[in-house]
Amino acid sequence: MKKVRRKGSSGLSELSEKAREQLAQAELRKLRQQFRKMVDSRKSFNFRHQRMIAGQYKEIETLKAEQAETTMLLSLVKSPKNLDINQKNFMELRFLLQTKGDYEALISSMKVLLGELDDKIVQMERKITNQRQLFLRTQEANNPKRLQRQIHVLESRLNLVTVHFDTMLTSNSQLRKEIEDLLFEKAAYDHVYQQLQRRLQTQKKTMNVAIEQSAQAYEQRVEAMARMAAMKDRQQKDISQYNLEIRELERLYDHETKLKSFLLAKLNDRSEFEDQAKKQEDVKSKKLGKKGKGESFASYEVAHLRLLKLAENGDLNQLTEDFLAKEEKNFARFTYVTELNNDMETMHKKTQRIQDDIINLRSQQQTSHEGTRSILKQMEEKLRKTTQEADIYETKYKEMSKTLEYLKNSVEKMFKKINCDATEILGKLGESGKVTDINLQQYFAIIEKKTNDLLLLESFRRLQEAEGPDVDVPQPFVNPFWGGSALLKPPEPIRVVLPVFGADSFSDKLEEVDSPLDHSTLQQMVLENFLQRERTKELQDTMSEKGDEIRLKKKVIG
């Protein structure tokens, strides 16, 4: 074990020594590289330093040479010979400047003369072109076929313009009729609207009256119901009181019946006793025979004895008074019972009458409610129909008012676009310069008059175009009724152009067409002619520019 450990420690020491050697070699390499770099940098620094020093030496030498030259030049300048030469040069320069000013004045005067000559040349060329145009016109005027063709073309154009004018007039009259119809319809709708408003107000009033009546009927019903409830309560109280009184009376009646039965029993007993007494008296009378009036007295005595037996204290007066009092009480009770029976019958009749009245009131209330409901339903149906009609008429009125407003705005725009004079309308009282229902006809009349004038101007312009362009070119006129006329440009100012002679292609095309042309074909032909003219103008401009360049070159050479 010890040997193995020694071998391992020796191996580790060898490895550490090798690693140290490698590290030392690497550090040595790095140091050598750094040394080389420092040597190279030193060499380069020395080389640059030497170059800088050499450049500075060269600059010093050049500066010395320049200093020598400047000193020599200063010495030469200050010499009297050079001073004389400078004086001579100064005098020559002054003379040359004076001559330059004279020549410039001559050049400006010559330019003015050349401009005048150019103007004269332009005027002469214009005269030549006018003479040529007059010559061509005379030739064309003397040509009968050309004249017939021009007449045919002008007639076709006039026919188209008149047809267009007639269509515009018919459309204008139709629009005027439509506006009048719309105004009448508006007035009728306004009248109907006012009537419907009145009917609606009356319906609302009747509805309010019906509502008030129904409210009053409801209040009366509530009052009647309250009365009925009070009467029912009163009836129940009366019935309860009546029942109590009946019970009391029945109790009294039972008591009286018991008393009567008792009295009847007593009376029956008494009558039996009296019958027995009468029988005994009869027997005695039979026994005694015929006796006088004294025997009746004995009977009275017997009766008197019986009455004394019946009396409590032997007082017959008290007995009679008690009997009479009892009879009076019985009679009073009998009368009271009869009165109560009569009152019961009257109360029954009253309750029956009240019940009949309640039934009648309920039936009347039900019928009145049904009537008011039916009336309210009818009124609601009428109100719904009237509101629907009013809504329909209101929508129609809004549509008509929108169309009228659109027509008014279009008329006002057309009036302003064609520059119509509104002094006649504005001179009237209450006019504010806006198109209204009242002054619409007047605006139409002014627009119609202006369209007639514009069509006359258009026909005159077309006649002038057919005859040929004059010297004084008129102002451009834009026809509002033709779409192609807006594409035509106004005539440009005349420039000096090389004369180019050629036939008019547009007139030749019109001559080739035998039938009258419509608006679309005319517009197409005008556009083609316009494009062709633009091309020819561009060619003429290029040629004129070339001619101007040649003239300038000639002038410069001259």
Curated annotation (Swiss-Prot):
Expressed in testis, brain, thymus and lung. Disruption phenotype: Male mice are infertile despite regular copulation. Display shortened sperm tails and malformed sperm heads and motionless spermatozoa. The 9+2 structure of the axoneme seems to be intact. Spermatozoa are able to activate oocytes when used in intracytoplasmic sperm injection (ICSI) and these embryos are able to develop to term. It holds the Pfam family ODAD1_CC. GO terms for biological process: spermatid development. The keyword Coiled coil applies. Keywords: Coiled coil, Differentiation, Spermatogenesis. InterPro entries: ODA-DC/CCD (IPR051876), ODAD1_CC (IPR049258). Residues 10-44, 185-259, 369-414 form a coiled coil. PANTHER family: COILED-COIL DOMAIN-CONTAINING PROTEIN 63. Plays a role in spermiogenesis. Involved in the elongation of flagella and the formation of sperm heads. This is Coiled-coil domain-containing protein 63. It comes from Mus musculus.
